[in-house]
Amino acid sequence: MWRRVFAMWGHSKKRISAGLRLSGAGGLSFLCLCLFGGSALAEFESPKSEYFTGFEASDNYASGYVGAGYALGKAGLYEPGFRLRAVGAYGRYRYDGALLTDHGYVPATFDGEDAFLAALAGYQFRTGRLITKLFAGIEAEDQHIVPHDPNNSVQGSALGLRLQQETWLDISPRFYLSADASYGTAFHEYCALSRLGFRATHRFALGLEGGALGNEEYDAGRAGGFLRLN
């Protein structure tokens, strides 16, 4: 699962938002959309590379991402072993605030753009139906807001360390649970997301998700639904 954190407010606030996420894949396998991965059914042959993409939208933002992963060594993606992953994302968002003028503070609407790249290395553990992945790497992010918001520190370009953990549990052939968390030092962004999914077919799944996310400027909650296409 991959989730970007946007700077939506000039002052720290708490917020609950709802949205819909659509994820899909091309190539050999699918990886679910805060750079998060997914799993596949064990009866399929395990490939060594994967390509994934996704899109999500809410009331004040929309974002998309693309990425790829590779399993090092002789084992495939669904077996224990070392992993490499690269992800790029782009998003646009809008929020309301205020600007200081000669006549005092006046209401203003800010439009933001966020571009993000990350390169990670990690290891996948597998015990029965449970898969756990641990990643670490570097991230680069650029936040651009128009007009410039002097009250928002999440602007400009930054490099940082990224840490990430992913878990996936097949409850049954139809149902699965996932729980993921990440933290990046570029703008001190964090994300934690849990999902309950239902496989309608081998190529289509849907379900519910909820979690928390934020950065050095704001904290928020998220609840919504998702669709997954293999």
Report the location of each language-model feature.
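Cleavable N-terminal export/targeting peptides
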Residues: 1-48
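A broadly tuned "polar low-complexity/structure-edge" signature
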Residues: 2-9, 59-69, 89-92, 218-220, ...
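Intrinsically disordered, low-complexity regions
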Residues: 11, 20, 25-28, 38-39, ...
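Short glycine/proline- and aromatic-enriched beta-strand/turn motifs that initiate or cap beta-hairpins
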Residues: 38-103
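Feature captures outer-membrane beta-barrel proteins of Gram-negative bacteria and organelles
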Residues: 43-44, 64-79, 117-124, 153-171, ...
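Transmembrane beta-strand segments that form the barrel wall of outer-membrane beta-barrel proteins
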Residues: 47-58, 136, 140, 173-185, ...
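Outer-membrane pore/translocation modules
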Residues: 78-189, 210
